Every structure is written in structure tokens, then in C-alpha cells.
């Protein structure tokens, strides 16, 4: 697939905007507690349900979505919680519900739970939830929980659900990309910014992997230039899983930028890889698990724990959703 210069500039700007949003979430990890937490009474809005816990006395906090590529169908939605003093709020799990805001009657359509996942390189982390959206448009997530001092808290925010995701949809055919392999370059540094790259992650192209009758894990990440600082740890997890599933699954790492040796500390010099554009990736890291038949099994935007990826790989090996 060929892209015009205009397409490349547009895509690059979109990527940098999204990464800036995620970097904003990361910055909360460096904030210190400077003021005491205060309790407020949440006033129900026209979009709130009368019996919602949001109408009880709770501390209102902020929720920051870390997932950008949301569309109808199955989604892995992640978010951070930020307290009134701008420090990250960390508890084991929170309750979530989702409302479709474009309906004539606003009501809870999906209820669930989100569990906390610590990021490996900071005091921040995200909450991970699974949700199936059946309608595109404006949705609201409401988060309720109890902090480590036993106090109730509440947060809500609106977000857009698209009719079609930027990245390949679940159960759709993935692009048969011909990414550069170790055999195509003179030095591994041309296709990997990892400090200690696992050479086995660079033996296959996506096209090769689709044609060898094994499931495939593809991680798009740029360890050296990652704005959220989670790309290196994510690639390391994929490498560790490669060892566990040796001979059962293909594993591939692809850089976000195609000229990693030319950037030299100036991200303005970075050129988005055409394969990143082909896959519609607008954040980093991004991990995909592909079935033997070349259809997408699952996808993971942002940092994903080893356990979560292990479970998904185990399911695809055993033909489970």
C-alpha cells in the first residue's frame, strides 16, 4: 500500500497528538500529594441515573482514557484515575458502567469491573476493562470505587466510539505486511531500538508468519523513543513469552519509525513506518494476536501485562475467543 506525503504528515501529526495525551497521563505519576483530599457531594446531571452511586457523597476524581482506538464490537478499554491533588489513584479494582449518550433515554447499558495494572517504569498505571459496544457515537464511562482509606470516589467522562476502528477489527483479515527482517539489513540496529534485542523477534515478516500455519504475536513499539516509556518493557514481555511458547507461536517486533538510526534525539526527524500506517496504529505500544488463518484474534493498545498476553495466546492456541 502506498501513501502520499500528505497522508504521512497527517498520520504522523495524529500519532504525536495521541502520544502527547498518553504522556500527560504518565506525568501524573511524578506529582506529589500537596493538599488533603476533600469530599464533595456529586450533583446528578441530566445524564445521570437517579439511583446512581454518583448522587451519594463521594470524592469526585478525574478519569483519563488511555485507549484511543474504540469502535463497535469487543474492546479492551484502559484508563487512569487522577485524584484532586493530581496524584494517581491506585486500588485493586473499580466498578464501571457505560451509558450511550446519544439515546433518547439515557440508561446503563454495560456494567463491569476494571482491574489495576501497574506500569513497569513509574508510579502510574491503568485500569483495564473489557466492554462490547453495539452502537457508534458518544458514550460515558462512570467509575466508582473505594480508596485505600475506605472513602468512596466517583469519576466520569465521555468518549467517542467509532463505527470502524483505525486498526484491524477483531476477526478481520490483517494486512499481509512485508516488514524488514534481520536478513534484510546489515545490522539489527536498523530495525530495532532495543538495547539488547532478541534476534528471534526479527526472523519473520507478517506475511511469512501468516503463511506458516502458526498463530502470531506482533508488537509495534519503539523502546528508545517511546513517549510513555513502556515500549521497552512491552517488547521484553513479548520476548519472554516467545521463550515460553517456542515452536507454537510466531513472535514479531516492528518499530514505529523506519529511520531509527537517523533520529539522533530529534523526534522531528522521525519517519512513521508505512507498516504502522497500514495497520492504523495511533499509539504505542500496540500488540496484536493473529490466528492461524490470518484473522485477528485480539489486540492490546498500550502496555499489557505478561499474564494478560499469556492468557490470550493460550486461548488462540486452543481456539478460544
List where the protein language model places each region:
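N-terminal secretory signal peptides that target proteins for export/translocation
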Residues: 1-12
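C-terminal motif of bacterial Sec signal peptides marking the signal peptidase cleavage site
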Residues: 27-30
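Bacterial signal peptide processing site
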Residues: 32-35
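Contiguous segments within soluble domain cores/interaction surfaces
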Residues: 37-188
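Short active-site neighborhood of thiol/selenol oxidoreductases, capturing the structured segment around
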Residues: 206-227
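Typically the conserved alpha-helix immediately C-terminal to a functionally engaged Cys/Sec
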Residues: 228-245
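Thioredoxin-like thiol-disulfide oxidoreductase module
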Residues: 256-284, 289-293, 314-315
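Non-catalytic, surface beta->alpha helical segment in thiol-disulfide oxidoreductase systems
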Residues: 292-321
Amino acid at each position: 500500500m502506498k501513501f502520499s506525503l500528505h497522508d504521512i504528515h497527517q498520520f504522523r501529526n495524529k500519532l504525536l497528538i495521541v502520544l502527547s495525551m498518553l504522556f500527560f497521563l504518565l506525568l501524573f505519576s511524578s506529582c506529589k500529594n500537596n493538599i488533603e483530599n476533600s469530599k464533595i457531594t456529586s450533583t446528578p446531571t441530566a445524564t445521570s441515573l437517579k439511583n446512581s452511586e454518583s448522587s451519594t457523597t463521594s470524592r469526585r476524581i478525574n478519569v483519563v482514557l488511555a485507549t484511543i482506538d474504540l469502535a463497535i464490537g469487543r474492546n479492551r478499554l484502559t484508563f487512569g484515575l487522577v485524584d484532586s491533588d493530581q496524584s494517581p489513584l491506585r486500588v485493586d479494582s473499580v466498578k464501571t458502567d457505560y451509558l450511550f449518550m446519544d439515546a433518547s433515554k439515557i440508561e446503563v447499558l454495560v456494567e463491569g469491573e476494571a482491574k489495576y495494572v501497574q506500569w513497569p517504569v513509574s508510579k502510574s498505571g491503568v485500569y483495564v476493562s473489557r466492554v462490547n459496544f453495539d452502537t457508534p457515537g458518544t458514550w460515558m464511562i462512570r467509575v466508582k470505587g473505594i480508596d485505600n482509606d475506605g472513602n468512596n470516589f466517583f469519576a466520569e467522562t465521555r468518549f467517542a466510539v467509532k463505527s470502524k476502528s483505525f486498526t484491524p477489527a477483531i476477526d478481520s483479515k490483517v494486512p499481509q505486511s512485508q516488514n524488514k527482517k534481520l536478513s534484510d539489513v546489515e545490522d539489527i540496529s536498523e530495525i530495532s531500538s532495543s538495547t539488547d534485542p532478541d534476534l528471534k523477534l526479527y526472523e519473520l515478516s507478517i506475511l511469512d508468519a501468516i503463511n506458516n500455519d502458526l498463530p502470531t504475536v506482533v508488537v509495534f513499539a519503539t523502546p528508545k523513543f517511546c513517549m510513555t516509556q513502556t515500549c521497552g518493557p512491552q517488547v521484553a514481555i513479548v520476548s519472554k513469552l516467545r521463550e515460553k511458547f517456542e515452536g507454537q507461536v510466531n513472535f514479531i517486533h516492528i518499530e514505529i519509525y523506519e529511520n531509527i538510526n537517523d533520529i539522533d534525539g530529534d523526534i522531528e526527524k522521525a519517519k512513521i513506518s508505512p507498516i504502522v500506517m497500514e495497520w492504523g496504529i495511533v499509539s504505542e505500544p500496540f500488540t496484536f494476536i493473529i490466528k492461524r488463518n490470518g484473522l485477528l484474534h485480539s489486540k492490546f493498545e498500550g502496555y499489557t501485562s505478561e499474564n494478560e498476553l499469556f492468557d490470550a495466546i493460550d486461548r488462540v492456541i486452543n481456539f478460544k475467543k
